């Protein structure tokens, strides 16, 4: 850890010098007060475009531009109509009708029909954990007429609108029926949505640039914007995503007016940016995000729960958070819970993660570990994740594991993590990721705590008990019973360990004062942002 602290100090000093230097020779390049293009730097490169195929947040953010949703969640946590004008449910709770509002068209000019939405819901429900719970009780996804989606159920599903309005990744975005009929394990072939921006295929260059242009035919709602709900007004004719993996380069571009908005600056650079009167810093997601070690429970060595428990014993959350987010305690906290802290189902089990290397070594020995290779895949171009892989590799070596640390770019990682083969055939043992507190707040939406096996999220933890508890939570008659079930699931997962929490953090976004209207929420929403 001391070496990492020295590297951090050297990095801060060197970067500060680089960022300060231009100001000594020339003033920052001023961006015009009114501009036709918003220039944005996302958290990572965009390699997969289909928001149903992948849970990568950057893909979900991209999808907010191109596609739209029937329902979305506001800051109060309540799902509200978006493409829908409203919904009705039969007295027995088994027949839902969702009505489409006026003016909905896909980017090719074809009207959005109920059958497009029914097919989109059906595809999403095969892939996403909350949707899979819904899918088990669905008789049919269909349409009563061109403007009315009809979902017939085998039994009531009171949280249907919450499922359709989930706010994080794997959101049920609506697509034309012909695209929605694509195998959910394969990427759709075109980006034809009904959202406020159109994807410019000819200018897409993964690793460099993504371009969107305003959808002039989009009809916004009349309500004020609130997270993913309300009026999605596209104030810029053109938005460019600039992929800049080097933080110092991104910071300099922001200071010099070469970009307008940097989604996720690294904490080391926040003090430098805070001194620039032309830049605003703001918390982007008030509930925060939970960072985790994700195990491949399908293959050795972490198919053995005893080895996963040994790793948990060695985890020191402070090491992870300080390595990634520095010493500013307003940016992170420890969180000894399998559900994010600050959410209704938070538990506090610090004894489960004592950071005790001796105990971890003993646990490995008792489990009969004999040097099986542990492959960690770690993204070099994702600052909110990369340092955590270094901490884990260091810790595993210290407790006696045979570590093969493989650094790759994020785009490669999100594809490689789908490999279920053993490590000697290109598989993996560990990667690191994070999820929003709201997006992982309950058993239905939290894909990393679910035990769906091959049908579940990367890592493929299989647990009939976890799945039954998720179903029991969904069927519970009241909030008190739901909390008891969620607590049982959390404690069970802490023992079985599909993942290990390494801390919760609160990122800041940075933008030039030449733009305004940037909203907090679950994504860097493009609507409402406008020239100042």
Name these PLM-found stretches.
Residues 208, 246-247, 265, 343, ...:
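Ligand/substrate-recognition segments at binding pockets and active sites
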Residues 220-272, 402:
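Ligand-site clamp/hinge motif
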Residues 399, 404-415, 443-513, 532:
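Extracytoplasmic/peripheral linker and loop segments enriched in polar/acidic and small residues
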Residues 133-180, 185-205:
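Surface-exposed binding/hinge segments that line
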Residues 41-91, 122, 192:
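N-terminal lobe/hinge region of extracytoplasmic solute-binding protein
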Residues 298, 302-342, 387-388, 493-503:
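Periplasmic-binding protein-like
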Residues 197, 330-366, 380-387:
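Structural transition elements
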Residues 511-532:
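Long beta-strand-rich cores associated with HINT superfamily self-processing modules
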